[in-house]
Curated annotation (Swiss-Prot):
Highest taxon of source: Bacteria
Its job: Catalyzes the hydrolysis of N(2)-succinylarginine into N(2)-succinylornithine, ammonia and CO(2).
Protein source organism: Burkholderia thailandensis (strain ATCC 700388 / DSM 13276 / CCUG 48851 / CIP 106301 / E264)
Family from the record: Belongs to the succinylarginine dihydrolase family.
UniProt keywords, alphabetically: Arginine metabolism, Hydrolase
Transmembrane helix recorded as keyword: no
A family per Pfam: AstB
Entry protein name: N-succinylarginine dihydrolase
Entry's Gene Ontology BP terms: arginine catabolic process to glutamate; arginine catabolic process to succinate
Length: 446
C-alpha cells in the first residue's frame, strides 16, 4: 500500500528557557542560566517545518504542553491560588519551578515510539508515549503526550495510542530518539531497530560518567506491545563511552531512513554484529542495507556532539535520493563541514544537505531530529489524522502571527517566578487549540 513518512514537529512553548536540567546533555549544562528567546525559538522551528513542507514532505505540528505545570507543583506540596503556588515554589524550591516550567516537550523525538501498520500484528499504527522517567522535567510529559496523540490520531480502527510504560528505572524509555525503522518502501513491512544504553537484568557494559536513559527491557516491552515480528525486530546497545561523551540518546550518534544507516563508527557495542543482524533481517524482506559509517579520523565523537551532525533528519525526496537536514552548527565546525561536502559530492544515497538555524533549541541540546516525531502513514491513515495539524501556507501564517502575539523575546530563569507567564501561556494555548482544531486539550480548559 502507498505510504509516506510524515514528520510531526513540536512547537516550542512560551516558557522555553535554559535551566540546565539535563545531566548528560552537554549543551543543556553549558548554557545553564543564560537568557532564552522563546519567540525566536518557536519561529526557528516553525520555519524548518514550513521549508520542509514546501519541499514536498508531509509535515505536521504537535502543540506545546501547559507550563508551568501547576499539577506537579501542587503534588509537591505547594498550595493556594495559582500565583501563590508559583511564588512559594520560586522561593522554597526554584529548581522544582524550573522543572515544572521546562518546554522540553518540544523535542517530540522523545514523545513516543511509533510503529506503522505494515509492521504491527493488528494492522494499526501504534504509539507508546515515552515515560522519560530519568528526568523529572520530562517524566511529567507522557500523560499530556498521550492525550495529544489521541486527539490527533483519534480513529481507533486505524491508530492505537497506549499509555506509557511504568515509570521505573528498569523500564526507562526515551521514545523514538532510540528507535528507527528500515524498509525498502515506507508502505512495505520493515525492520524496527531499538537502541538501548543498559540492561536492568543482563550483565553488560555501562557508562560511568553519565546515565544510560534507555533500557533493553523498555525497548523489548514497546516491541511486544506493538505486536512486532520477532524476526524483524533488532536490538543494539549504544557504546557506553559515547554516552559518557555526551551522546545521551542514539539520535546524537546515528540516524536511519529506509535502507540507509548513517552513523559514527563508535556508535554501537559490537558494531559488526549489529550491521550483520540488520543486513540479514532487511535482506529477508528483499532489501539491502546501506551503512554510511563516519570514521573517528574524519569526525570525532566530540565534533559530532558539538555540531549535532547525526541529530539530523534523513529524508527521501521524490526522486528517491536522500536529503540530510542539519543544524547550522555543522557548518561552523571545519571537520564536519568538510565531511558533509564530501558526502554530498559522493556516489552514496545522500546527495543533498540543507542547513537550518535552530540555535535556540541547539543551546538546550536539541537539533533537527530531536524536534520531530516520524509517523509512517498510508493514504487512508493520513486522511484520518486531524486535518488542521498539517503545515501549509495558511497554518504557517496563523502560527507565525500567534507566536508574534503571545511569545516573549527574552526569558531568564528569574522570569519563571512571574505569575503573568502562566496566564500568558494559558491564553496562548487556548487560542492554539482553536487554530489546530483539537478541542479542550489542556487541564485548564476542562
Amino acid at each position: 500500500m502507498n505510504a509516506k513518512e510524515a514528520n510531526f514537529d513540536g512547537l516550542v512553548g512560551p516558557t522555553h528557557n535554559y535551566a540546565g536540567l539535563s545531566f548528560g546533555n552537554v549543551a543543556s549544562l553549558s548554557n545553564e542560566k543564560s537568557d532564552a528567546n522563546p519567540k525566536a525559538a518557536a519561529k526557528q522551528g516553525l520555519r524548518k517545518m514550513k521549508q520542509l513542507a514546501d519541499l514536498g514532505f508531509a509535515q505536521g505540528v504537535l502543540p506545546p504542553q501547559e507550563r508551568p505545570s501547576l499539577r506537579l507543583l501542587r503534588e509537591l506540596g505547594f498550595s493556594g491560588k495559582d500565583a501563590d503556588v508559583i511564588a512559594k515554589a520560586a522561593k522554597q524550591a526554584p529548581e522544582m519551578l524550573a522543572a515544572a516550567s521546562s518546554a522540553s516537550a518540544m523535542w517530540t523525538a522523545n514523545a513516543a515510539t511509533v510503529s506503522p501498520s505494515a509492521d504491527t500484528s493488528d494492522g494499526r499504527v501504534h504509539f507508546t508515549p515515552a515515560n522519560l522517567c530519568s528526568k523529572l522535567h520530562r517524566a511529567i510529559e507522557h500523560e499530556s503526550t498521550r492525550r495529544t496523540l489521541a486527539a490527533i490520531f483519534a480513529d481507533e480502527a486505524r491508530f492505537a495510542v497506549h499509555d506509557a510504560l511504568p515509570g521505573t528505572p528498569a523500564l526507562g524509555d526515551e521514545g523514538a530518539a532510540n528507535h528507527t525503522r528500515f524498509c525498502s518502501e515506507y508502505g512495505a513491512p520493515g525492520v524496527e531497530f531499538f537502541v538501548y544504553g543498559r540492561a536492568e537484568y543482563r550483565r553488560g557494559p555501562e557508562p560511568t560518567r553519565f546515565p544510560a536513559r534507555q533500557t533493553f527491557e523498555a525497548s523489548r516491552a514497546v516491541a511486544q506491545r506493538h505486536g512486532l515480528r520477532e524476526e524483524a525486530t533488532i536490538y543494539a546497545q549504544q557504546s557506553p563511552d559515547v554516552i559518557d561523551a555526551g551522546v545521551f540518546h542514539n539520535d546524537v550518534i546515528a540516524v536511519g531512513n529506509r535502507d540507509t544507516l548513517f552513523c559514527h563508527e563508535r556508535a554501537f557495542v559490537d558494531k559488526q554484529a549489529v550491521y550483520d543482524a540488520l543486513t540479514a533481517s532487511l535482506g529477508a524482506l528483499g532489501a539491502r542495507l546501506n551503512v554510511i559509517e563516519v570514521p573517528e579520523r574524519a569526525v570525532s565523537v566530540a565534533d559530532a556532539v558539538g555540531s549535532y551532525l547525526f541529530n539530523s533528519q534523513l529524508l527521501t525526496r521524490e526522486d528517491g535520493r536522500q536529503l540530510l537536514v542539519v543544524p547550522q552548527e555543522c557548518r561552523e565546525n571545519a571537520n564536519v563541514s568538510a565531511y558533509l561536502d564530501a558526502l554530498a559530492a559522493g556516489n552514496g544515497p545522500i546527495r543533498d544537505v540543507r542547513v537550518f538555524d535552530l540555535r535556540e533549541s541547539m543551546k538546550n541540546g536539541g537539533g533537527p531530529a530531536c524536534l520531530r516525531l516520524r509517523v509512517v502513514l498510508n493514504d487512508a491513515e493520513r486522511a484520518a489524522v486531524k486535518p488542521n495539524v498539517w503545515i501549509g501556507d495558511a497554518l504557517f501564517a496563523s502560527l507565525d502571527a500567534w507566536i508574534d502575539k503571545h511569545y516573549r523575546d527574552r526569558l531568564s530563569p528569574a522570569d519563571l517566578a512571574d505569575p503573568a507567564l502562566l496566564e500568558e501561556s494559558r491564553t496562548a494555548l487556548d487560542e492554539l487549540t482553536q487554530i489546530l482544531g483539537l478541542g479542550s486539550l489542556y487541564d485548564f480548559q476542562r
